[in-house]
Amino acid sequence: MTMLTRITTDTSFKQHLRWSPDGKKFLFTRIHEGKMALWTVNADGSEMKRFMPNLDTPHFDGDWSPDGKTILYVHDVLQGTDGKLHIHRVNADGSDSKVVIPNKAFEETPRWAPDGKTFLFVSTRDGNQEIYRADADGSNIKRLTNEIAADNNPCWSPDGKRIAFASHRSGNLEIWSMTADGGDLKKLTDHPAIDFWPAWRPDGKTIAFTSNREGNYEIYLMNADGSNPRNLTHNPAQENFATWSPDGKKLAFISTRDGGSDIYVIAVK
């Protein structure tokens, strides 16, 4: 019997789930009363609250730094009127927000490197969705992918040597991996369904991902080399945005299995 725990019960739309480095909190995007904003909740489901309650413009898709002291997030300053998004960095208490990637285009999906010295992000600055890497202060930007098709959903391996990501480059959405410099491309999934949103387990041996290969979106696991893909959640609901606990023993995700959109945690052997 697989242990499954429901963390939230408010049913509001949620996405972009991230487990904190100390394992005590979740950071996620929530749409509530018509506003898209970052929220936090304790890992036991208590104290759900807006992360930056005084920020009224849309902000979403946050990521904790490895030391838990800062958060990168996407900010739609002009609420879609200019067709651009910024990436900001803010202290974990919500103070001192700064722009690190100005809004040249759609700048999104920031992901800290395991050493906290650089981060990945997705941008359309060169015409389509590509993956870039920048230093922690937003400087020294390097383009890692160069493909006509869209590349997105980047995720670091725990040792910082490789990056898993989703790409349309083979015709349908599959999960690939590359080195931290964009080399040694490897196709990890090969299925006519949609595979995306990879999440590398802290031990480096397993990758969780979302797929609709059995009809609806569910959470799957595969070995880090792409072998042995298997369905973890086995539920007719829609499930996405997997994130690992720091010890790698649990996986959190967002599911509609109880009618709304809530956070669940499942134990993983």
Residue positions per predicted region:
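Sequence signature of WD/YWTD-type beta-propeller architectures
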Residues: 1-269
